[in-house]
Amino acid sequence: MRFELTFRNLEASDAIKAYAQDKLAKLDKYLRPPAEAHVAFSMERRLHCVDVSVHEAGVHYQGRAEEQDMYASIDAVVDKLLRQLHRNRDQNHNHRRGPQADEGPRE
């Protein structure tokens, strides 16, 4: 996955970049290549905000988290994206499976 990291209203930190890339790497097993992630880190009032947009083969996933700690924000937004990916995968899987067949005639 290709990452694009943007920092608004705060200094760029190598530790935050590495942590975000490590956490977002968990999404790779659910995405088809080529996938891109646009991550924006910002500070609003006293909250650390993380916005993530993930694009893959015509599908777009987006998440936003605001927490007191930047690392907690990253964890929260990754959890949101994982839920979206699971939901999409389950919907596609169930759609392809088709309707369940009846067990047989009832007597």
Positions of PLM-derived features:
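N-terminal, polar/charged subdomain of small-to-medium soluble alpha/beta proteins
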Residues: M1-E107
